Amino acid sequence: MGNELESLQTIDRVEILTLMDNYVDVLLTNTDIVYRPPLAKDGQIPADTLVAEHGLSMLIKLYRGTESHTILFDTGYSSIGVIHNMEMLEIDPSEIETIVISHGHMDHTGTLYPILEKISGPVPLVIHPDAFASPRYFVLEDGRKLLFPQTLDKARLEKLGARLMERREPTLIADDMALVTGEVERTTTFEKGLPNAYLERNGNMEKDPILDDQAIAVHVRGKGLVIISGCAHAGIINTILYVRKVTGISDVHAVLGGFHLSGAFFEPIIEETINKIRKLEPKILVPMHCTGWKAIHRFSEEFPDSFILNSVGSTFTIVS
């Protein structure tokens, strides 16, 4: 596994399958870019269905010549949702070569242990050290503290075969075909993070900048960067700008994932985010998860040619 950023390799194709998101619609239609699983198989509509939850998980497949790699990015909220959807989509967990966790919050780590139990042999787990930070809180205006569940335990992960790769810096994976950003530089003035997030460290309460927030990027030959975020607590614009900086690649072809624009704290920056994304001119824009309904609706209005509605089970394919 390399760590020289200049050696990020171009790829021929990337396939991004949504294993979990906040929304599912079994009646959406296919396009040249996105494939939706059919309602029926062999003439029969199944009695069971794909499920959605407030969480995110994606299976990313990379192709270059005869070489291919499979990455699992995040694992949803519940302990059962992603596994259930993998079974419905006939995905074999043993295909997973590397797991990347975007950050330590519960809605991105829920099915991690059950998945590790189904993977035979050790598997690299790329994660920021602060993902293990605990206790973490939401602090309300009246001073009440809401404790985040501690879902990540190093000893348990290692016992189940996870080969922990704790990284703060950008890291190349999948034979240098994908980049995990590590800590994202915060350079914009309007993306200020989660204002009521706190962390207890050495007995002291302090603001939690969620430094463990990270994304994945690949470079599709002849197209440009495909950037995949988890929650983008660092800010989706900060994330895009940082990927451009560390790769030296300016063309942004696609941005997919959580943009964290939902709720009272973040809705005021929806329009500024739209303005910044417009200048980047992505050809494909797929907001998911914590982007929120209002922001997703605005993206659909402002970017009718590039916006694609996500749904659990959707596979996005970008080819050189």
Predicted feature residues:
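Cap/insert and terminal regions of metallo-dependent hydrolase folds
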Residues: 106-109, 124, 203-312
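Active-site metal-binding loops of divalent metal-dependent hydrolases
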Residues: 20-22, 75-77, 104, 129-131, ...
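Active-site-proximal beta-strand elements of phosphoester/diester hydrolases
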Residues: 15-19, 70-74, 178-184, 225-231
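Active-site metal-binding motif and surrounding structural segment of the metallo-beta-lactamase
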Residues: 80-127, 132, 247-254
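Conserved beta-strand hairpin/beta-sheet module of binuclear metal-dependent hydrolase folds
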Residues: 22-25, 30-89, 209, 213-228
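Short acidic, glycine/serine/threonine-rich loops at helix termini
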Residues: 28-30, 136-140, 267, 299
